[in-house]
């Protein structure tokens, strides 16, 4: 769920999840146009990951994970929860690995500036 995703973002980036709300064209919704930078591309890939889970509820299904030796370990009983956790883990790692591309000018980015068809997943 968004709760666990938020915790992962804090643990891996030391940024508040609010830093990524309405960032670029893909973080926090929108999902149109082209990613503005590598940080926004992380969110694009995350959206694609969620698209592979049509029978799950990634924004509301709560799952369990461990934070062990600086690593996220997904531990869930159901396939949906495990896969949601893996999608969220991947985006949190991607955001951490691309912290150097984070640009404040893309925070609360106006959605109308996101034009064109998005890349294919």
Swiss-Prot record:
InterPro entries: PLipase_A2, PLipase_A2_Asp_AS, PLipase_A2_dom, PLipase_A2_dom_sf, PLipase_A2_His_AS. Keywords: Disulfide bond, Myotoxin, Secreted, Toxin. It comes from the Eukaryota. Monomer. Belongs to the phospholipase A2 family. Group II subfamily. S49 sub-subfamily. Snake venom phospholipase A2 homolog that lacks enzymatic activity. Shows high myotoxin activities and displays edema-inducing activities. Has cytotoxic activities against HUVEC cells (LC(50)=2.5 uL) and human lung adenocarcinoma A549 cells (LC(50)=2.9 uL). Negative results: does not show antimicrobial activity against E.coli and S.aureus and does not produce appreciable hemolysis on human erythrocytes. The keyword Disulfide bond applies. Its main location: secreted. Residues 104-116 are annotated as: Important for membrane-damaging activities in eukaryotes and bacteria. One of its GO terms (cellular component) is extracellular region. This is Phospholipase A2 homolog EPL_00195. Pfam families: Phospholip_A2_1. GO terms for biological process: arachidonate secretion; lipid catabolic process; negative regulation of T cell proliferation; phospholipid metabolic process. Expressed by the venom gland. GO terms for molecular function: calcium ion binding; calcium-dependent phospholipase A2 activity; phospholipid binding; toxin activity. Disulfide bonds join 25-114, 27-43, 42-94, 48-121, 49-87, 56-80, 74-85. It comes from Echis pyramidum leakeyi (Leakey's carpet viper). It is found in: Secreted.
């Amino acid at each position: 769920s968004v709760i666990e995703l938020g915790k992962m973002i804090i643990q891996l980036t030391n940024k508040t999840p609010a830093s990524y709300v309405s960032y670029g064209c893909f973080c926090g919704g929108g999902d149109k146009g082209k990613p503005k930078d590598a940080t926004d591309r992380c969110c694009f890939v995350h959206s694609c990951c969620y698209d592979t889970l049509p029978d799950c509820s990634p924004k509301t299904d709560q799952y369990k994970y461990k934070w062990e030796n600086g690593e996220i370990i997904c531990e869930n009983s159901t396939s949906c929860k495990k896969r949601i956790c893996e999608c969220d883990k991947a985006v949190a790692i991607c955001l951490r690995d691309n912290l150097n591309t984070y640009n404040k000018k893309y925070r609360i980015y106006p959605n109308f500036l996101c034009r064109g068809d998005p890349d294919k997943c």
